[in-house]
């Protein structure tokens, strides 16, 4: 069975993990209202998708 001959240092361990960081979601600006939204999804602010109204959004008073 394979066993490490030497202890892995903190620097070597951390260098190996340098690619493990998580990225945030890729957001795009809505062409209708300008709010940030997820791509290929209906805008939660205005309800538009691909240039037309898909969801009727209630106005907050």
From Swiss-Prot:
Disulfide bonds: none annotated. Pfam families: Ribosomal_L32p. InterPro entries: Ribosomal_bL32, Ribosomal_bL32_bact, Ribosomal_zn-bd. GO terms for biological process: translation. GO terms for cellular component: large ribosomal subunit. Residues 1-24 are annotated as: Disordered. Keywords: Ribonucleoprotein, Ribosomal protein. This is Large ribosomal subunit protein bL32. It comes from Rubrobacter xylanophilus (strain DSM 9941 / JCM 11954 / NBRC 16129 / PRD-1).
């Amino acid at each position: 069975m394979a066993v490490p001959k030497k202890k892995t240092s903190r620097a070597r361990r951390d260098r190996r993990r340098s690619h493990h960081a998580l990225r945030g979601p890729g957001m795009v600006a809505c062409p209708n209202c300008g709010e940030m939204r997820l791509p290929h999804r209906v805008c939660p602010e205005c309800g538009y998708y691909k240039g037309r109204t898909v969801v009727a959004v209630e106005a907050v008073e």
